[in-house]
């Protein structure tokens, strides 16, 4: 064996699960993706079984062995903080080959991907949204109360507001908008005739329509522009709350699928944040931050060579 350690990381969001097996040089041995697995939506037992199925496939693909030990497994899981040690307890039974396991909320990996394992904060904007703050071994979130309560500015919220605006235009209750045409282009029929599929697909499917807001805004559509502006303001409001809580300057990493796909949205949010916040626009995927945390578990800091090798391996 040309390496000393086998490490793994997985990242779970509302729409997808990403996992990698790698060594201490950053060489990726296997990568497996699956559908999202938020434990608030799936239930903790179903979620743990879902992660275990993906990870067992990852381990087998990367080692060719059903029992080869994995030195470290780090997980970044949306909504993990609501379940205490429940996920660790279940996965330690389902994945007996793992020697060391640590699972945190999905924000910590985003901080570490850009800042390393140190204090800071991140704003996630993907299917959902929230701000995570890490100070030493403690972390907390602001916002991110789930799509039933509060997921402001997120992909789900943007998609939902686009669909609502189109339905209001159809009813004659709202302003006419090009969103109607863009939504129909994606789903193949008027959005108001697509409700069986919308309710069947639920939150992840509705989030796939978020792109229509950015496309319509680029076309000068005032309805889409208002949705965009509302989302940016709401996300910046979370950053202001974080600034009040910390009471000092700090780094805020912006990451997540929506920010990555539509950097103009990230810039709009950043422009509305308090000046004491140093905005860091992420240029790495969340799974890289998970790798940084896995390496931290073996006392290693991810230097430039590791980063370059790992990111090149992701493709």
What are these regions (language model features)?
Residues 80-177, 311-315:
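Phosphate-binding/catalytic loop of phosphoryl-transfer enzymes
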Residues 1-64, 68-70, 91-93, 114-121, ...:
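ATP-binding/phosphotransfer module of carbohydrate and carboxylate kinases, centering on a glycine-rich
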């Amino acid at each position: 064996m040309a390496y000393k350690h086998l490490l793994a990381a997985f990242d779970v969001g509302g729409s997808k699960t990403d996992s990698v097996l790698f060594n201490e040089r950053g060489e990726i041995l296997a990568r497996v993706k699956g559908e999202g697995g938020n434990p608030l939506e799936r239930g903790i037992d179903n979620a743990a079984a879902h992660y275990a199925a993906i990870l067992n496939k990852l381990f087998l693909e990367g080692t060719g062995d059903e029992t080869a030990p994995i030195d470290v497994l780090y997980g970044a899981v949306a909504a993990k903080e609501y379940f205490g040690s429940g996920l660790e307890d279940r996965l330690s039974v389902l994945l007996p080959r793992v020697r060391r396991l640590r699972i945190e909320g999905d924000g910590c990996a985003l901080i570490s991907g850009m800042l390393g394992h140190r204090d800071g904060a991140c704003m996630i904007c993907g299917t959902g949204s929230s701000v995570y703050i890490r100070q030493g071994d403690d972390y907390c979130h602001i916002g991110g109360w789930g799509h039933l309560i509060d997921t402001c500015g997120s992909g789900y919220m943007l998609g939902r507001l686009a669909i609502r605006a189109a339905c209001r235009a159809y009813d004659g209750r709202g302003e006419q908008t090009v969103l109607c045409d863009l939504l129909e282009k994606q789903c193949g029929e008027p959005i108001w005739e697509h409700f069986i599929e919308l309710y069947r697909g639920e939150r992840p499917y509705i989030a796939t329509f978020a792109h229509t807001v950015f496309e319509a805004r680029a076309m000068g559509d005032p309805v889409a522009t208002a949705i965009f502006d509302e989302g940016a303001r709401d996300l910046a409001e979370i950053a202001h709350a974080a600034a009040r809580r910390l009471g000092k300057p700090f780094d805020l990493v912006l990451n997540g699928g929506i920010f990555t796909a539509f950097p103009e949205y990230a810039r709009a949010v950043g422009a509305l944040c308090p000046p004491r916040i140093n905005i860091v626009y992420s240029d790495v995927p969340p799974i890289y931050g998970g790798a940084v945390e896995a390496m931290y578990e073996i006392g290693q800091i991810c230097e430039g060579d590791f980063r370059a090798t790992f990111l090149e391996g992701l493709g």
